[in-house]
């Protein structure tokens, strides 16, 4: 496809803007705490949109609309499950984790928090969790780089190899320079761009088809099953789709946003902003695919690319319905979704190496300046490994991404949830929950028992493991229980009246 000048200019301005934010954040990064968690200074608006953007990758603008375009409204069960899971995560985990990480050695990372929370002198929790993060997030990063390369390849007519570097370069640069603040500030801009694209596009599609009623009739005429929420689904399938929401409790890049909030009181306001953003974005993505059925049914001559690859439904609608300047802005939203998730994952990998391996085992007394530069170098190293994996988009290792979400959700989810909710939890309980949750996901995936998504049994068995091994072993030390009680009391302290929860 020949790229228009307006679209090229729009993409370049957008990418330059993200790099500029990285340089601005660089000036605010004084120490390693700033580089990894932004000095715990994020207000509710940035916390909310950064958490949302880091969660929603290119799947939001390509995968979900494409699935709905192919199969109808029944594909929206996953969006319902994600919404419920995210809300419960904000409600039960976000504020508590913000407080508990501060009370446990002012932990900067999830492995660091586990070590402090459970007084793990053996540091086995730190090692296992850091290695799990490093392994799966490097693969996640590779998947994000492939998505960015595909966008540049199809939009600019580049070769895949050129697109690979072009798509990754800007994200690597602003993450390297500005660290957590750059990632969070760019996430906020990117989240705003994503919601703009996902609200505007379906509205224009509906208008172009003749209104909501006419669009719905066209969709029904094509196939009545398009409007059937239960099309081809049994109870297990619905539970499996909704089970995706359990993954939120264990995603390190999302949990890092909670840890970086300026106060646990601001989490209440952040939750409202984030959930509003998420519901509107998911509804918009479903609407793009759903009403795209009507548009391309009325314009079959324009449906060639979409019929070959349903995930292009948003791209094609943007290019057909809008002038090149607006189309460039809308297509930048896909790049925003990819960049926001990739940058967060690069930073989490970097922090796992720098804080949980380099500082913990090699250079305990390293200076703040040294740690910041090691963190920056690790961003480059992880990015280069991810690019090497992404060089062959057919690489089978990239298939691991399909259940890495389940792996994190089952291995870390129950541990995080119980750690902030139950004072009797012990190190052995945490270790058992992590191992049982991860192994269940791996084994269940191989055998596919009952057709049930592996995160559900993984989460259940991991939770059981935590309870059983915690109760069988020695009770937590008096110091551990006192620290938990103090953190819990702090969490339940009265918030300022303007943020008081209803």
Curated annotation (Swiss-Prot):
Induction (record text): Up-regulated by propionate.
Keyword Ribosomal protein: no
Region (Hydrophilic): 27-66, 88-124, 151-162, 185-189, 214-231, 249-274, 296-319, 341-370, 392-397, 424-430, 446-448, 476-502
A Pfam family matched in the record: SSF
Entry's transmembrane regions: 6-26, 42-62, 68-88, 127-147, 163-183, 193-213, 235-255, 276-296, 320-340, 371-391, 398-418, 428-448, 449-469
UniProt keyword terms in alphabetical order: Amino-acid transport, Cell inner membrane, Cell membrane, Ion transport, Membrane, Sodium, Sodium transport, Symport, Transmembrane, Transmembrane helix, Transport
Activity regulation info: Activity is stimulated by phosphatidylethanolamine and phosphatidylglycerol, but not by phosphatidylcholine and cardiolipin. Proline uptake is inhibited by the sulfhydryl reagent N-ethylmaleimide (NEM). Proline, in the presence of Na(+) or Li(+), protects the carrier functions from NEM-inactivation.
Changes seen on gene knockout: Mutant is defective in proline transport. Shows reduced growth rate when grown on propionate as sole carbon source.
Cytoplasmic side: 27-41, 89-126, 184-192, 256-275, 341-370, 419-427, 470-502
GO BP terms: proline transport; short-chain fatty acid transport; transmembrane transport
Membrane topology, from the record: Multi-pass membrane protein
The reaction(s) this protein catalyses: L-proline(in) + Na(+)(in) = L-proline(out) + Na(+)(out)
pH curve summary: Optimum pH is 7.0.
GO-annotated molecular function: L-proline transmembrane transporter activity; proline:sodium symporter activity; sodium ion binding
InterPro entries, per the entry: Na/Glc_symporter_sf, Na/Pro_symporter, Na/solute_symporter, Na/solute_symporter_CS, Sodium:Solute_Symporter
GO cellular component labels: plasma membrane
Location in or out of the cell: Cell inner membrane
Regions of this protein lying in the Periplasmic compartment: 1-5, 63-67, 148-162, 214-234, 297-319, 392-397
Known outcome of mutating residue 344 to S: Small decrease in proline uptake activity. Confers resistance to N-ethylmaleimide. Exhibits low Na(+)-dependent proline binding
Marked site (Involved in high-affinity binding for sodium and proline) residue numbers: 344
Subunit annotation: Has been isolated from inner membrane preparations as a homodimer.
Cited PANTHER family: SODIUM/PROLINE SYMPORTER-RELATED, SODIUM_PROLINE SYMPORTER
Protein name according to UniProt: Sodium/proline symporter
Species, as recorded: Escherichia coli (strain K12)
């Amino acid at each position: 496809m020949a790229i228009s000048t307006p679209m090229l200019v729009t993409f370049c301005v957008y990418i330059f803007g993200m790099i500029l934010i990285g340089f601005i954040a660089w000036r605010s990064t004084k120490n390693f705490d700033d580089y990894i968690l932004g000095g715990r200074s994020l207000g509710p608006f940035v916390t909310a949109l950064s958490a949302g953007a880091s969660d929603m990758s290119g799947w939001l603008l390509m995968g979900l609309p494409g699935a709905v375009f192919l199969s109808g409204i029944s594909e929206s069960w996953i969006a319902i499950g994600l919404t419920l899971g995210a809300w419960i995560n904000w409600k039960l985990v976000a504020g508590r984790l913000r407080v508990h990480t501060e009370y446990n050695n002012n932990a900067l990372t999830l492995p660091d928090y586990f070590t402090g929370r459970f007084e793990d002198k053996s540091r086995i929790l730190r090692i296992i969790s850091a290695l799990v993060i490093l392994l799966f997030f490097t693969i996640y990063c590779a998947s994000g780089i492939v998505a960015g390369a595909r966008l540049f390849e199809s939009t600019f007519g580049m070769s895949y190899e050129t697109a690979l570097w072009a798509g990754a370069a800007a994200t690597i640069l602003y993450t390297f320079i500005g660290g957590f603040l750059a990632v969070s500030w760019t996430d906020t801009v990117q989240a705003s761009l994503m919601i703009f694209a996902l609200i505007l596009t379906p509205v224009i599609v509906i208008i172009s088809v003749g209104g909501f009623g006419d669009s719905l009739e066209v969709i029904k005429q094509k196939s009545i099953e398009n409007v059937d929420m239960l099309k081809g689904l049994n109870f297990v399938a619905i539970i499996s789709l909704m089970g995706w929401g359990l993954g939120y409790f264990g995603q390190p890049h999302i949990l890092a946003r909670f840890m970086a909030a300026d106060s646990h009181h601001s989490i209440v306001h952040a939750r409202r902003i984030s959930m509003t953003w998420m519901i509107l974005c998911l509804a918009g993505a479903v609407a793009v695919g759903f009403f795209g059925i009507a548009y391309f049914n009325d314009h079959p001559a324009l449906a060639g690319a979409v019929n070959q690859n349903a995930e292009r439904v948003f791209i094609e609608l943007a290019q057909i319905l809008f002038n090149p300047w607006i189309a460039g802005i809308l297509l930048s939203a896909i790049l925003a979704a990819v960049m926001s998730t990739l940058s967060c994952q690069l930073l989490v990998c970097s922090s796992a190496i720098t804080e949980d391996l380099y500082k913990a085992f090699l250079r305990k007394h390293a200076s703040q300046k040294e740690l910041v530069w090691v963190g920056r170098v690790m961003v480059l190293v992880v990015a280069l490994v991810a690019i090497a994996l992404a060089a062959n988009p057919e690489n089978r290792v990239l298939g691991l991404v399909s259940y890495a979400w389940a792996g994190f959700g089952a291995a870390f989810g129950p541990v995080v949830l119980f750690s902030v909710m139950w004072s009797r939890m012990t190190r052995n309980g945490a270790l058992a929950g992590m191992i049982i949750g991860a192994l269940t996901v791996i084994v269940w995936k191989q055998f596919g028992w009952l057709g049930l998504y592996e995160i559900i049994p993984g989460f259940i068995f991991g939770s059981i493991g935590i309870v059983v091994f915690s109760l069988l072993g020695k009770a937590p030390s008096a110091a551990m229980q006192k620290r938990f009680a103090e953190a819990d009391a702090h969490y339940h302290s009265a918030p300022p009246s303007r943020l008081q929860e209803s």
